[in-house]
């Protein structure tokens, strides 16, 4: 994508966009679903603002909503007004989506001719989806899960219980949804806001999207049923299915597990996965990932154990082709020309400074190992001790034992 021809009318004349930003803007003008995965410092925010304003100027969109982390709400508004002083921007304040003012704010979104509507991450989930649209979506998800159970009757008990739990969760939402949306202040719902573009900053915050799988013994598949991710999935699918645009921004698209690649594909190219018969994780993993048994240090730091993880991609050219259809990935090394340069690291890599252990730390690690064994054997109540508590205290101990006992001497 070559955006060198873009002139960006209406932008602050003091701003000079870099070549990679113009290229990204041109891609956002051409495609409806894009993950902008540029490294930190490459100007993703300004690129996104310029793309929205250019789409609006060309009549390609009517109204865009930008979802940002709470602490960045005002920063986004200020940068947008700096770049486009004449932009019509509606920015949600701390109380605009409270129960008392939500109806008024939704009315302002729906009836105003806004270029950009900026809402904080915590408030986005308060924008209600209409009963009919939500019921259709939830019933569809329930049917998919039930079909998965039927087609995989040989799955392990743990995996089956997890899927049954998700079904009950969706059924509970179906039962409660009607009464929740009878409030007169929420009569304006997501479908009525007039949005045809949704742009999400720090998109990695929505990676915990539930998917059914038989791989209950594979470590690293943190398959939690995140309400925040599911809400984003519903609204993004509605935007896409109605011809709108969906854009995610993040410097860390994949952080913990290969399964996050599948989640990104569900968000940004679901229709492609449907055509390929890969909407479920297990056939996707069979095609693109390989489970490997590897020795790993135990979470409590008391020894090693063998874990099975999806640690290797296979059929990489085919997967790369699919990802390139929506993912705009860029590293500093690719743009370090002219005035865009990052200082080099000493010896071209981070330096590891080793510190000697202490008797107190070694004793505490041994204690953590005993606690972890008790948790795995089920001899201790989760309310009293659990792996999350053990790993959290282990990190504190590794940093400084005084975080656990302030009476200890300094190292």
Walk through the language-model features, giving the residues of each:
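Post-Walker A helix-loop "phosphate-sensing" segment adjacent to the P-loop in P-loop NTPases
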Residues: 55-61, 268-273
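Conserved pre-motif I regulatory segment
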Residues: 2-37
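Pre-Walker A (Motif I) flank of P-loop NTPase domains
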Residues: 31-36, 62, 115, 244-245
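Glycine-rich, phosphate-binding/catalytic loops in enzymes
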Residues: 53-54, 81-84, 133-137, 214-222, ...
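Walker A/P-loop
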Residues: 32-51
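Residues at the beta-strand->loop junction immediately N-terminal to the Walker
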Residues: 37, 67, 250
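Inter-lobe coupling linker of SF2 helicases/translocases
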Residues: 102-149, 158-161, 165-197, 205, ...
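Conserved Walker A/P-loop ATP-binding site and its immediately adjacent core
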Residues: 47, 60-89, 96, 122-123, ...
């Amino acid at each position: 994508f070559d955006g060198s021809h873009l002139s960006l009318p209406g932008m602050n004349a003091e701003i000079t966009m870099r070549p990679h930003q113009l290229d990204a803007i041109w891609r956002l003008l051409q495609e409806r679903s894009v993950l902008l995965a540029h490294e930190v410092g490459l100007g993703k925010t300004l690129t996104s603002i310029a793309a929205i304003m250019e789409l609006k100027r060309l009549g390609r969109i009517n109204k865009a909503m930008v979802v940002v982390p709470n602490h960045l709400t005002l920063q986004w508004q200020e940068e947008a007004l700096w770049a486009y002083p004449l932009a019509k921007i509606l920015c949600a304040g701390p109380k605009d989506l409270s129960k008392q003012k939500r109806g008024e704010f939704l009315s302002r979104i729906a009836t105003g001719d806004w270029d950009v509507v900026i809402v904080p991450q915590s408030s986005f989930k308060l924008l209600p989806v209409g009963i009919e649209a939500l019921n259709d979506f939830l019933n569809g998800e329930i049917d998919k899960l039930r079909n998965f159970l039927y087609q995989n009757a040989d799955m392990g008990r743990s995996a089956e219980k997890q899927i049954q739990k998700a079904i009950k969760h969706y059924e509970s939402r179906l039962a409660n949804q009607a009464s929740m949306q009878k409030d007169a202040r929420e009569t304006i719902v997501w479908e009525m806001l007039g949005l045809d573009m949704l742009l999400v900053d720090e998109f990695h915050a929505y990676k915990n999207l539930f998917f059914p799988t038989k791989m209950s013994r594979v470590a690293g598949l943190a398959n939690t049923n995140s309400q925040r991710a599911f809400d984003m999935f519903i609204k993004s699918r509605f935007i896409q299915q109605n011809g709108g645009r969906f854009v995610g921004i993040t410097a860390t698209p994949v952080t913990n597990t290969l399964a996050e690649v599948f989640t990104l594909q569900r968000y940004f190219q679901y229709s492609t996965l449907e055509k390929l018969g890969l909407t479920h994780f297990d056939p996707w993993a069979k095609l693109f990932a390989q489970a490997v048994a590897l020795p790993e240090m135990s979470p409590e730091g008391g020894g090693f154990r063998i874990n099975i993880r999806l640690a290797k991609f296979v059929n990489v050219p085919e997967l790369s082709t699919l990802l390139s259809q929506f993912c705009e990935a860029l590293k500093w090394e690719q743009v370090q020309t002219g005035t865009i340069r990052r200082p080099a690291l000493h010896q071209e890599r981070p330096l590891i400074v080793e510190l000697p252990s202490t008797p107190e730390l070694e004793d505490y690690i041994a204690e953590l190992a005993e606690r972890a064994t008790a948790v795995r054997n089920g001899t201790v109540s989760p309310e009293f001790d659990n792996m999350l508590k053990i790993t959290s205290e282990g990190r504190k101990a590794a940093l400084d034992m005084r975080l656990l006992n302030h009476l200890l001497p300094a190292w």
